């Protein structure tokens, strides 16, 4: 349906914008960009999807395996996992910083802040690779709580997990849960420190 809608818009506006067209999008929009190109290859001159997931089911499972075994080098994957473990080991010291951050940003969640903190730490590996951030910029594990926390918040803002009433992408999450699918988290290396259990 989205590809048909885009084709109708392109057809309607062709007389106003007669030159070459570009289609782009991120996440679901990236997928839509690819579908649009597949169904209407002559509508646009360029298709530029930024992150265009093609999940095979509601619980795809490929992302976790890829991040655990294939993303980057073994040393990079270990550095990311070590950072995540350190952030979880320090959770009791990080929670006052996290609670303050949440309060300063007027964030509200459906679950306890400790659960959201876990999700932020779990999201870190996917987010780092998705946005192409350099692994060598991860601070030393001997850095202060404040330095490690600031780095984590820069890379994974907890606004991603906002209460549905405050999240303008709620409709996407509903569709992802019911139709499109979404990635999960590999929690095995972290279970002893997590408050979230699945």
Residue positions per predicted region:
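Alpha/beta-hydrolase fold nucleophile elbow
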Residues: 17-27
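Short, surface-exposed basic-aromatic patches at helix termini and helix-loop junctions that form
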Residues: 15, 36-45
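A catalytic-pocket lid/entrance helix-loop region that shapes and gates access to the active site
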Residues: 43-100
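Glycine-rich nucleophile elbow surrounding the catalytic serine of serine-hydrolase chemistry
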Residues: 25-35
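Short, flexible loop/turn elements at secondary-structure junctions
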Residues: 27-28, 51-54, 181
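Alpha/beta-hydrolase active-site loop
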Residues: 1-16
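Structural recognition of the beta-strand scaffold that forms the well-ordered cores
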Residues: 22-24, 46-49, 176-178
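Alpha/beta-hydrolase fold active-site neighborhood
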Residues: 100-198
């Amino acid at each position: 349906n989205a590809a048909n809608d885009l084709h109708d818009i392109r057809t309607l506006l062709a007389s106003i914008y007669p030159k070459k067209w570009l289609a782009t999008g991120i996440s679901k929009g990236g997928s839509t960009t690819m579908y649009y190109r597949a169904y209407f290859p002559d509508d646009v001159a360029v298709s530029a999807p930024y992150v265009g997931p093609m999940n095979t089911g509601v619980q795809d499972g490929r992302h976790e395996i890829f991040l655990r075994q294939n993303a980057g080098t073994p040393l990079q994957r270990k550095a990311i996992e070590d950072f995540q473990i350190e952030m979880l080991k320090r959770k009791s010291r990080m929670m006052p910083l996290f609670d303050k951050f949440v309060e300063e940003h007027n964030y509200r969640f459906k679950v306890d802040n400790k659960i959201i903190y876990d999700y932020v730490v779990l999201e870190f590996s996917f987010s780092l690779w998705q946005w192409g951030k350099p692994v060598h910029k991860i601070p030393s594990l001997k850095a202060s709580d404040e330095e490690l926390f600031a780095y984590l918040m820069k890379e994974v803002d907890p606004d991603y997990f906002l209460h549905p009433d405050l999240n303008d992408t709620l409709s996407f999450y509903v569709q992802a849960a019911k139709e499109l699918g979404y990635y999960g988290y590999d929690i095995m290396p972290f279970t002893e420190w997590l408050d979230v259990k699945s």
